């Protein structure tokens, strides 16, 4: 009897210890690995990158939902290309990280906000190229998990009915673009289909262009499906003169227009 009580006490102690470890402060956990060299070798091979404080972040260090991780950055100088790489995300191409998007802002400073998927604790790299071909970067570590391979209840009819639906909200200096799209990355399990397709094939936005009275504010190409389902793009711009026009294209070649 005493032996049984002792065993039970040890089990309870082990459970409590596991719970304490799970909710321990971030500083107690192992440091997030930095794979910047692998990212450079995969996407910017042969380029020399200089760290820059002109690229800043406004993010939470931990996100509870790996499928919807808020990510916001500001590029204070003018750059012709800005790439966002999630180092810890899988991708069909070999190497480190998933290139979430490459942007081409026409204004500076440029503040951009969206939600991304994260499969594991990871550094997010923002790598910018100026008009002279010089490359700069900054990075931030965020803790989250399970966002790329998480299963989902998938209603194909509902998705096809709403896909591409847009809403554009704007003030004179700030705008938000909402696009209905499943953003499948090729790793998600279809939990609602027990006899047919189990892994949902890759299907996500491939490009977006935002214009103000035919003058482009920014455009972007997307890769790897690291941008979250039903993406929202929030950005700042100098005085917006008219109603914004948005053209989005996905990996199936479908075009969607919003204004």
For each predicted feature, which ranges?
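A general "mature secreted/periplasmic domain" signal
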Residues: 32-160, 164-171, 176-259
């Amino acid at each position: 009897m005493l032996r049984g009580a002792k065993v039970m006490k040890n089990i309870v102690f082990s459970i409590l210890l596991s719970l304490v470890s799970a909710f321990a402060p971030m500083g107690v956990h192992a440091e997030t690995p930095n794979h910047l060299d692998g990212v450079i070798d995969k996407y910017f091979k042969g380029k020399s990158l200089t760290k820059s404080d002109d690229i800043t972040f406004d993010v939470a260090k931990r996100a509870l939902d790996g499928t919807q991780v808020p990510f916001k950055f500001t590029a204070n100088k003018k750059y012709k290309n800005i790439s966002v790489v999630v180092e810890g995300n899988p991708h069909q191409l070999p190497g480190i990280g998933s290139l979430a998007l490459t942007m081409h802002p026409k204004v500076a400073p440029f503040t951009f906000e969206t939600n991304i998927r994260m499969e594991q604790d990871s550094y997010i790299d923002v790598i910018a190229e100026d008009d002279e071909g010089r490359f700069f970067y900054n990075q931030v570590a965020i803790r989250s998990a399970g966002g790329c391979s998480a299963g989902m209840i998938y209603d194909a009819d509902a998705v096809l009915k709403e896909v591409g639906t847009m809403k554009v909200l704007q003030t004179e200096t700030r705008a938000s673009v909402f696009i209905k799209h499943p953003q499948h990355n090729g790793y998600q399990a279809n939990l609602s289909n027990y006899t047919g397709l189990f892994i949902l094939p890759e299907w996500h936005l491939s490009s977006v262009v935002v214009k103000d009275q035919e003058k482009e504010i920014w455009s972007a190409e997307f890769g790897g499906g690291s941008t979250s389902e039903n993406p929202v793009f929030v950005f700042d711009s100098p005085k917006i003169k008219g109603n914004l026009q948005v053209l989005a294209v996905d990996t199936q070649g479908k075009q969607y227009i919003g204004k």
